[in-house]
Amino acid sequence: MFSRAARSLVMRTGLRTRGTGTHSPGDAAGSQRRMTPYVDCYAQRSYPMPDEPFCTELSEEQRALKEKEKGSWTQLSQAEKVALYRLQFHETFAEMNHRSNEWKTVMGCVFFFIGFTALVIWWQRVYVFPKKVVTLTEERKAQQLQRLLDMKSNPIQGLAAHWDYEKKEWKK
């Protein structure tokens, strides 16, 4: 725990053993900016402590509350403590860990595209693909089978081996 906090402090303050780190912005243009893991003042579970408070421009009530904060915390009510917390942080851990309903949108889009694809396939089968060939009808398939049997094709292991030519039926 301590090593993680120390590493976080070193990374935030910019104390590095080398001039540029692996993931640092670099000194190519002479910039001394450092990349903070905390972006846009929104807390993340991996980095919940912001470098700067959530609210930087305070109203008169909030300034008075900040002055009252410098005194004893036993004098503060629960609502004032919550208001001070909200000045510093955007969300609580419970709010950060709360599940979003984004999965509903994703699943809706997935089902929409599956339905659209099914409509395109149906349209292609009806209007684009040619009609069934005549040779695929049941009558033609029966004629082809009879022709193969008449030619006695593959008499050892094929169709002719399972056909009884005397009784004109399949062997049992």
Swiss-Prot record:
Read off the SUPFAM superfamilies from this record: Mitochondrial cytochrome c oxidase subunit IV (SSF81406)
Q: Where is this region: Disordered?
A: 13-32
Where are the Mitochondrial intermembrane topological domains?
128-172
This protein's major location comes to mitochondrion
Which residues constitute the organelle targeting sequence? 1-34
GO CC terms, sorted:
mitochondrial inner membrane; mitochondrial membrane; mitochondrion; respiratory chain complex IV
Q: Where is the composition biased (Low complexity)?
A: 13-22
Could you list this entry's UniProt keywords, alphabetically sorted: Membrane, Mitochondrion, Mitochondrion inner membrane, Transit peptide, Transmembrane, Transmembrane helix
Q: How does it assemble?
A: Component of the cytochrome c oxidase (complex IV, CIV), a multisubunit enzyme composed of 14 subunits. The complex is composed of a catalytic core of 3 subunits MT-CO1, MT-CO2 and MT-CO3, encoded in the mitochondrial DNA, and 11 supernumerary subunits COX4I, COX5A, COX5B, COX6A, COX6B, COX6C, COX7A, COX7B, COX7C, COX8 and NDUFA4, which are encoded in the nuclear genome.
Q: Which pathway? A: Energy metabolism; oxidative phosphorylation
Q: By its UniProt entry, which Pfam families does this protein fall under? A: COX4
Q: Which residues lie on this side of the membrane: Mitochondrial matrix?
A: 35-101
The molecular function terms in GO held by this entry are: cytochrome-c oxidase activity
Entry similarity comment: Belongs to the cytochrome c oxidase IV family.
Q: Main role?
A: Component of the cytochrome c oxidase, the last enzyme in the mitochondrial electron transport chain which drives oxidative phosphorylation. The respiratory chain contains 3 multisubunit complexes succinate dehydrogenase (complex II, CII), ubiquinol-cytochrome c oxidoreductase (cytochrome b-c1 complex, complex III, CIII) and cytochrome c oxidase (complex IV, CIV), that cooperate to transfer electrons derived from NADH and succinate to molecular oxygen, creating an electrochemical gradient over the inner membrane that drives transmembrane transport and the ATP synthase.
Among the GO biological process terms of this entry, one is: mitochondrial electron transport, cytochrome c to oxygen
The keyword Cell cycle belongs to this UniProt entry's keyword annotation: no
Give the transmembrane region(s). 102-127
Task: Give compartment(s).
Answer: Mitochondrion inner membrane
Q: How does it sit in the membrane?
A: Single-pass membrane protein
Name this protein carries in UniProt: Cytochrome c oxidase subunit 4 isoform 2, mitochondrial
